[in-house]
């Protein structure tokens, strides 16, 4: 589609100083000169247990009590960056599954974008949606709105 073509052209222009497809400014400010130190820094990182899961449960419980029907957007991590920092795919999968399970427990409708970890230009930095990511989000929001 034309939107995707435009998104890719803009992304290429804005990510020209690094091999991770991240915004030039972000990469320069937060990673560039520290790149080598980032390699394998997350080798022991795990989200098997995290207090943030309880925070998510509280949010979903409030939604249930107030009869709010949210669309929970489950954003992926940046796959290539996570690999570089040593946050292994199996541990990311465990994290994704934990979040999915919590959403299912509360009957929360979810836009699961976690399958796009390696999609070029889906993320604009290590954790935020990028050009293709926002297109996927926009399409889902439109569908969600008209489906209510």
Regions found by a protein language model. Give the residues of each.
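Generic detector of short, locally flexible boundary/turn motifs and exposed helical patches
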Residues: 34-39, 74-77, 100
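A structural motif corresponding to the C-terminal end of an alpha-helix
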Residues: 55-70, 101-109
């Amino acid at each position: 589609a034309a939107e995707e073509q435009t998104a890719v052209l803009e992304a290429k222009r804005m990510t020209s100083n690094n091999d991770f497809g991240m915004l030039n400014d972000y990469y320069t400010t937060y990673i560039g000169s520290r790149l080598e130190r980032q390699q394998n820094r997350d080798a022991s990182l795990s989200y098997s247990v995290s207090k943030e899961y309880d925070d998510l449960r509280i949010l979903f419980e409030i939604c249930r009590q107030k009869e709010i029907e949210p669309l929970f957007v489950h954003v992926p991590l940046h796959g290539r960056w996570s690999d570089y920092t040593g946050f292994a795919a199996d541990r990311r999968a465990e994290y994704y599954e934990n979040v999915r399970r919590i959403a299912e427990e509360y009957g929360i409708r979810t836009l699961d974008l976690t399958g796009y970890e390696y999609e070029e230009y889906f993320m604009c930095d290590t954790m935020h949606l990028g050009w293709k990511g926002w297109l996927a989000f926009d399409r889902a929001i439109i569908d969600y709105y008209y489906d209510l």
